[in-house]
Amino acid sequence: MKQFVRPEFILLKEGQDKNYGKFSVSPLERGFGITLGNAIRRTLLAATPGASVYAIKIAGATHEFTSIPGIIENVTKIILNIKQLVLRIDTSIYSDDEVVQLKIRSDIQGPVYAGDLELPAGVEVLNQDLLIATISEGGILDLVLYAKNSRGYKTFKDNKNEKNIEPGMITIDSNYSPIIKVAYSVDSAKIGRAIDLEKLELEVTTDGSITAIDAISIASKILVAHLEFFIDLNREISVLEVIGVNQTDDKELDRTVEELDFTQRSLNCLKRAGINTLRELVTKNEDEIGSIRNLGRKSLKEIKDKVASLGLAFRQS
């Protein structure tokens, strides 16, 4: 079997807290950009595990339409607030579906925030400034939240079937997915004489309980685990190497910067910096290129666009 080109995974941009990331995968042979992009996107959204509250218990409340004396918000509003809670439950301490309880009991007049919750070991609240409820004069908030690790989305009706639901507990909708947004795009890429290649770009935003790069890694692991059942149907095929060793055309990398059709200003800056070939250019990181004397933003953009159009990228910092 003719082997496929080995693609390279590159981090293009990352948020300061790492809950956002933009990544590229190239070169891919024609058709694999959409194939991989769509599969990873759907797996990220539907199957990435996370933590969520699925039920609550409030002293004085028997259902979600109750109003509690001394609490400004009714139970419906409190539930809406709780559904915005971002949790991280340590999977090395708690097994799948193991329930943890987050509690608060307060009679102090004023707002109660997520950061006021009493947490068991291995449980973390990431948005501690989230308002849970407001206690007025003479009020008492006695609240227990029931949370666990799982995946997907479950309605309050689904959660009524949980085995540990007891009288007095109010089930709520639970969204276990830590993924807020996934987008992908596919562009053409070129390496040497090969012009029918593709570049996949992925953008992932999470709720902060997992980094964007870890989310992609987990989603990919889930995909591969399911595909292995098909691979193992034939032992001979299961050991077949279908991805080749990365053999970027040396002649392509040895092209001089004069051959890359840069404007004279960009060309002069590169030459003064001792960059004479494409190989020398892509061994620099973007900060090193940007710090070249007299290289302005327009020239930097020109150089970045040229490198990207060749299906290449600068060295990561």
Swiss-Prot record:
Top-level taxon in the UniProt lineage: Bacteria
InterPro entries xrefs: DNA-dir_RNA_pol_insert, DNA-dir_RNA_pol_RpoA/D/Rpb3, DNA-dir_RpoA, RBP11-like, RNAP_asu_C, RNApol_insert_sf
Enzyme Commission code(s) on record: 2.7.7.6
Keyword Nucleotidyltransferase: yes
CDD domains membership: RNAP_alpha_NTD
Keyword annotations from UniProtKB, A to Z: DNA-directed RNA polymerase, Nucleotidyltransferase, Transcription, Transferase
Iron-sulfur is among the record's keywords: no
Renumbered residue ranges of the record's region Alpha C-terminal domain (alpha-CTD): 249-317
SUPFAM superfamilies: C-terminal domain of RNA polymerase alpha subunit (SSF47789), Insert subdomain of RNA polymerase alpha subunit (SSF56553), RBP11-like subunits of RNA polymerase (SSF55257)
Residue ranges of the region described as Alpha N-terminal domain (alpha-NTD): 1-234
GO BP field: DNA-templated transcription
GO terms under cellular component: cytoplasm; DNA-directed RNA polymerase complex
GO terms of molecular function: DNA binding; DNA-directed RNA polymerase activity; protein dimerization activity
Reactions that this protein is recorded to catalyse: RNA(n) + a ribonucleoside 5'-triphosphate = RNA(n+1) + diphosphate
Functional note: DNA-dependent RNA polymerase catalyzes the transcription of DNA into RNA using the four ribonucleoside triphosphates as substrates.
Protein family membership: Belongs to the RNA polymerase alpha chain family.
HAMAP family: RNApol_bact_RpoA
Comment block on domains: The N-terminal domain is essential for RNAP assembly and basal transcription, whereas the C-terminal domain is involved in interaction with transcriptional regulators and with upstream promoter elements.
Subunit record text: Homodimer. The RNAP catalytic core consists of 2 alpha, 1 beta, 1 beta' and 1 omega subunit. When a sigma factor is associated with the core the holoenzyme is formed, which can initiate transcription.
Name assigned to this protein: DNA-directed RNA polymerase subunit alpha
Source species: Mycoplasma capricolum subsp. capricolum (strain California kid / ATCC 27343 / NCTC 10154)
Name of the gene encoding the protein in the UniProt record: rpoA
